[in-house]
Amino acid sequence: MGKITVITGGTSGIGRGIAEKILAESAKTDRIFVTYGHDEKKALSFQESLPEEKRSQVTLIKADMSYYEEMMVFVEELKKQTDHIDWLVSNAGISTYAKYEDYSFEEWTRIVNTNLSVPVFMVKELRSMMVEGGSVLFTGSYAGQQAYSSSLVYGVTKA
């Protein structure tokens, strides 16, 4: 039984770097499940960039983490494909650069859902699949420690 890693938002940026590092050090029996939100072209480009002998270890799953319902569809799909998780990396995140007074309630809610609420409930849903000694990682940001007026809501969710 190989190690199972789940990475949300794993086709670009920090998530992609984590996926590539884990894959580089993985055994042939290990698997990585990577979510992507909207950009299927970028997701396929990520998969094609992987070493050919490792590509079959990576499963891409479309899931917009700003919606609880899509996260639940992802969780159900994951449960069909594996019986355990060793590492869960909650990396999906979004931001809008705007002044506080320019945020709409809908935009604020979308960012909070993507960066905080949905990931917390995803961990709750996947908790029973986590192996003893497994790890959950939430990626944060320096913006969570140092306030920026242009990305207030992002900073709040990444503290």
Residue ranges of each PLM-predicted region?
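Conserved NAD(P)H cofactor-binding loop of Rossmann-fold oxidoreductase domains
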Residues: 91-96
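Substrate-binding pocket helix/loop in short-chain dehydrogenase/reductase
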Residues: 99-100, 107-112
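Conserved glycine-rich cofactor-binding loop
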Residues: 11-12
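Conserved glycine-rich Rossmann-like NAD(P)H-binding loop of the short-chain dehydrogenase/reductase
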Residues: 27-44
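Residue(s) in the substrate-gating loop at a strand-loop-helix junction
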Residues: 141
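The beta1-alpha1 cofactor-binding region of Rossmann-like NAD(H)/NADP(H)-dependent oxidoreductases
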Residues: 40, 62-73, 105
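Active-site helix of classical SDR
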Residues: 123, 157
